[in-house]
Regions:
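N-terminal secretory signal peptides that target proteins for export/translocation
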Residues: 1-6
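N-terminal single-pass transmembrane signal-anchor helix
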Residues: 7-38
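Juxtamembrane interface helices immediately C-terminal to a transmembrane segment
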Residues: 29, 38-49
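Short, well-structured segments within or immediately adjacent to enzyme catalytic domains
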Residues: 44-279
Length: 279
């Protein structure tokens, strides 16, 4: 009887170990699927955020008789872009993508920091003493006309350095292909058709003063991407992943990274036959 009791206890322990092993195996099998579902949910929330921001922008546009050079645009960009606060202990709201939340405490940063594929940027306005954080980049080609009105003393500089900016809504030939907002690592971007993609897909080769600003958008924040995200991706290979883009006509969609070069970023934009860097 004693031997039988011992055998029973040993068998129960083996059963328990088998159950644990099965649970671990199922967890390993389900983990990628759960991760994909979570990423998809984040992408949907992110796209909804962009639509709300775009709606706010459209309301300002309509109140100003559809004029891109109205001063209200400059006011909107200054006062209502990014999550703004004097402290910002935890940035929330429509400017923060759940796939790229705030990584650093803004008050600990002197001038802010670039974002990454996984985190929001932080921008500091010394004039107002406020931080603005966000996960989305505005197409600055749409805002320069308003900046010229707000700062006429700088108009010649805008005209010389950024002659392709949209001067009026009539310059926008294809509103459904003209980006207003996109996932990015910096508040504003000036993309050009000749821009090369980044090698660092985490930071978008995040050098603040680069003239190659398509890099600020070429981060695989959504869609199918390698894990971990590479920091030395060959520029002659198709880019993985995608970003959410909100367009001037008000709609938004998930755009694969290589397709960013096929959108109408400024008034003189000519989409290349293939993305720069591809053989």
């Amino acid at each position: 009887m004693k031997l039988s009791a011992k055998s029973g206890r040993a068998f129960t322990l083996i059963e328990l170990l088998v159950v644990i092993a099965i649970i671990a195996l199922l967890a390993a099998l389900l983990s990628p699927a759960l991760s994909r579902a979570r990423m998809k949910a984040h992408q949907v929330v992110c796209l909804g955020n962009q639509r709300q921001i775009n709606l706010d922008f459209r309301m300002v546009l309509e109140d100003g008789n559809q004029r891109l050079d109205q001063l209200e645009f400059r006011d909107w960009e200054r006062d209502r872009t990014g999550d703004r606060s004097a402290t910002l202990p935890a940035a929330k709201g429509v400017w923060i993508c759940p796939s790229a939340p705030l990584a650093s405490h803004p008050d600990a940063l002197s001038w802010g920091e670039m974002g990454t594929v996984h985190s929001a940027y932080v921008w500091y306005d010394p004039g107002e003493g406020l931080h603005a954080s966000g996960s989305y980049s505005r197409n600055r080609w749409l805002m320069i006309a308003a900046l010229r009105q707000a700062y006429p003393e700088d108009a010649s500089g805008w005209d010389a350095n950024y002659p392709e900016y949209f001067r009026s809504e009539s310059d926008i030939a294809r509103p459904a292909f003209t980006p207003f907002l996109a996932d990015g690592v910096f508040p504003v971007v000036y993309p050009r058709a000749s821009d090369l993609p980044p090698r660092d897909l985490i930071r978008g080769d995040g050098f603040l003063f680069t003239t190659n600003q398509m890099r600020f958008l070429s981060i695989p924040r959504h869609g199918t991407r390698p894990n971990p995200v590479p920091t030395d991706w060959p520029t002659n290979q198709p880019l993985p992943g995608a970003v959410n883009v909100s367009f001037f006509d008000g709609h938004g969609e998930l755009v694969k990274l290589d397709r960013l070069w096929q959108l109408d970023w400024h008034s003189d934009y000519r989409p290349p036959a293939k993305r720069p860097g591809l053989p």
